[in-house]
A protein has these predicted regions:
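Charged, terminal alpha-helix-loop-beta segments
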Residues: 1-291
């Protein structure tokens, strides 16, 4: 289950040893704070893990970004090694310096328009006063306790979204959000079909659905305590079976026309599999200047 211990949670709050680190992460719209299994917290930047935080027996530990990002460059200068950790955590300027250096390394290694859109969608949907709330980014089904022959392939989900408007059954739907930015992300007919098949495989697996629902409940509760969500979530009645959401982001009419073809392909495949039609969300990424 995606949850951290109460002791770990308190460390991010007022007076906790991780409070300054949390504040630096929370104030930066390019960083995403996500709860993971085994009591870990992972911080993402451009879809890449920039930091992992653990807390055990009253003491924190911090793992920086993977060596692959600086194999041919200079690693971040800020130390999170055991002997230096508590001192580093006391200095906001050092924490900001780490993320600045780490971002630069990731940016050199991998750029991503898709993440920028994904992050902005997350930031714009953090309130339960809105129709939709993004609960988690890059969620992945833990399968270590599932037999190899029963495991589901490619279970990483771009966005886990909760609908605050109840459906006809009086439940709040959980959506597995798949993000497509521009025509370069569609991967042709097979790409969109693969995503529908993957989602249907997940939805048809009772263990996967139960694990997702349990995680969503836990994540909402703990992120609310940390102030990462706004509004009242106590009236939610989460559905047991998630649905698919397809978020199509276009830049101009030509990209929209191409993505409209992808929309029909997705709907046709869903009908063939006898699954609920994906909820389509359109977003124009072009910015029109106005005064």
């Amino acid at each position: 289950m995606r949850a951290i211990t109460d002791e770990h949670l308190q460390a991010y709050l007022e007076g906790g040893c991780l409070q300054k680190l949390f504040n630096v992460i929370d104030e930066d719209p390019e960083l995403s704070f996500e709860l993971r299994v085994k009591g870990e917290v992972m911080i993402y930047y451009h879809k890449d893990k920039i930091m992992t935080i653990r807390f055990c027996k009253g003491k924190p530990s911090v793992e920086i970004l993977f060596e692959k990002y600086y194999k041919k460059a200079t690693p971040p200068s800020v130390s999170f090694m055991y002997d230096d950790l508590m001192e580093t955590l006391r200095h906001t300027d050092q924490l900001r310096k780490y993320f600045k250096e780490a971002k630069r390394l990731i940016g050199s290694y991998k750029a991503g328009l898709e993440f920028e859109v994904q992050q902005n969608i997350t930031l714009g949907n953090r309130s339960f006063n809105n129709r939709f709330v993004v609960v988690d980014m890059e969620w992945q089904l833990p399968q270590s306790d599932i037999k190899v022959e029963e495991r589901i392939s490619r279970t990483r989900i771009d966005l886990v979204v909760v609908d605050t408007k109840k459906n006809d059954m009086g439940e709040n739907d959980i959506y597995l959000g798949e993000l497509k930015v521009g025509t370069g992300a569609t991967g042709g007919k097979s790409g969109i079909i693969d995503h529908v098949i993957k989602t249907n495989e997940f939805i048809s697996n009772a263990k996967a659905c139960a694990a997702l629902r349990k995680d969503v409940e836990s994540i909402i509760r703990q992120k609310a305590v940390l102030g990462l969500f706004e509004g009242d979530y106590t009236g939610l009645n989460l559905s047991d079976k998630p649905r698919m959401m397809l978020i199509l982001v276009y830049r101009g009419s030509e990209e929209r026309q191409v993505l409209e073809v992808q929309e029909e392909i997705a709907k046709d495949k869903a009908r063939e599999l006898k699954m609920a039609e994906p909820l389509l969300v359109w977003h124009n990424a072009l910015i029109t200047l106005e005064v």
